[in-house]
Amino acid sequence: MLVLEKAAACGGTTALAEGAVQASGTQWQKEIAGVTDDSAELHKKFWLTDAEGIVKEDLVECMAKNAPDNLKWMADSFNITFSNVFGCYPTPYMKDEYMRDRIHLITDASDETKTGGVVWTTNAQKAVEEKGGEIQTNTEVTDIYQDETGTVVGVAAGKKNYKANKGVVFAMASIDHNEEMSFRYDQQQYWDLKTQFVATAETNTGDGIRIGMAHGADSAFHGAVDLILQTWSYTNNQNPEIPYILIDQRGNRFVREDTTYAFHCRAMFNAAMAQGGIDGCTYMLMDSKMTTADAKCAWSDNAKDGAKAREAALADGSMVQADTLEGLAEKLGMSGTNLKATVDAWNAACAAGEDAAYGRKVQLTALDTAPYYAWKTQNTNIGSIGGLIIDTDARILDVDGNPIPHLYGGGVNTAGWLGPYYPGSGTCLQGALNWGRIAGASAAASK
């Protein structure tokens, strides 16, 4: 086996990630989280619900069914264990019965102080090389070769061509840093590139997708994987959450805030576009309780250099502060009457213990203590959603739905299994595991 890696080192965005992988019914889920009533069927229904009808059910079913065995294979093959299991937050239409703690944190089995995606990429590279696999870094694949039957027989990489005896597997990430492709196919990703912050590996430019489409492969693009990094809001159910509401440029709430992070970030994108186009924005509205919030809030006095970060945000204008809501609204260029009405309604909901407007359940905490703060939200993008359509054998399909012979796809340069927003941490790494493993097996079995 030959691995051609574009970057100077292997790992990509996976090596930068926290190392979360979703699965149901594992030994770790039972032992660590105490969850004994989960199943692949419930996991499938969870993923399908958040997909909003724009995934291929057979792909989602394949992932959910294989997920527990994929984790066991990962542990057995790469000296990995899982030191924590936690859950994600729901969406407004998610049924409680589909929710379970399924997110497994990757940990080195020999040294449990080592966690994260880098453990997997490091240990996997070692295992590949020990089994005789060859890895070439700083080698960018620029095209594929097909014979007269359309079968993929090799790749071009710089001045060299490589023959593929069994097939080619694309595992080349999505269009995260490709502004041209984002402009064409993924408005939310384009907005993130132009106005927000994209934190993925710089080499993620959708090379496999571009090459595949040039050779007739089908594709689908939907949105982005966004989160609010400054507060880690609703990224997992073990994190403490800070009191705030999200408001648009008119001072209105527009989403249930305690939803899984990519869901409310998609709503932030839509609200910004609806009122300001590409220059639009939303705000996180807080009161003085923010300054004493948990250390995961970047501006809290409890965070490392939190007070300095707050001062810097106030100095650069990304955050504004006022002693009254009307004064805050004036600084934001919105109606003070409307902003006060929004906060009054929120505080009344907190007093009643019910958010009748949006159904929020977590941190029903009044915003009633001056000074008040509004932070112009910034999404941190950890990946785009879009790629080449595959089948359950990880074969890349052409626009007529037929497999392109000897061309396979793994990870997030494939599509059909992720919907319009990210359904919670650990989905992408399970996708990398599942489709990469299947793609390798399919290529090995090809004739």
Spans of features found by a protein language model:
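Glycine-rich FAD pyrophosphate-binding loop
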Residues: 1-16
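Core beta-strand elements of the Rossmann-like FAD/NAD(P) dinucleotide-binding domain
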Residues: 136, 158-167, 402-404
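Conserved redox-cofactor binding core of oxidoreductases
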Residues: 62-159, 179-180, 350-369
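A glycine-rich dinucleotide-binding beta-alpha-beta segment and adjacent secondary-structure elements
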Residues: 143, 338-421
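Rossmann-like flavin
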Residues: 36-96, 320-338
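Glycine-rich loop(s) and the adjacent beta-strand/alpha-helix scaffold that form part
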Residues: 163-230, 438
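An anion/pyrophosphate-binding glycine-rich loop and adjacent beta-alpha core
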Residues: 209-211, 215-334
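N-terminal glycine-rich dinucleotide-binding loop that anchors FAD/FMN and/or NAD(P) in oxidoreductases
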Residues: 16-45, 339
